[in-house]
């Protein structure tokens, strides 16, 4: 290996190590009693059931989990009501939105930009954000197995935040866990909260 090639190799290797370190940043643990907001749509609100996942998550974590889910909300709606969420001064926001955008055929780039703008405003306030992927609701998916929309992975990577993937897709693909084609039942919301709690532990947030 020539001196120039060796130098190039060392520069590339060093850059790779630095990138890996920045991407594996340890999350700050949220203490019991701290305020956490669940921000989203009907899947957060608990439509179709007697319980919602934030209620179960509060039992599992000891956090004060505030449910800011509104049935029918799109990414634009959540962005518009974000000041109310920020006024609660949460340590962490569990953010899941997009399903209604898909159903209403909102342009993907518009949805993506709304989600990014919401995340950036929260981060600018020093709030930790965990993004929750939602299924890509299509006609074929409604009668088969759901899959996450790929944009969530892109957003999480771009904003360097953790992504809880496949949770809703798995639950809504199981008829025993849902109340209709796009909403969970009591068992489904409870299972979501339990799996989310496991993921939060893996991320060092719990």
Role assignments for model-derived ranges:
Residues 55, 59-60, 79-206:
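Alpha-helical cap/lid subdomain in secreted, periplasmic
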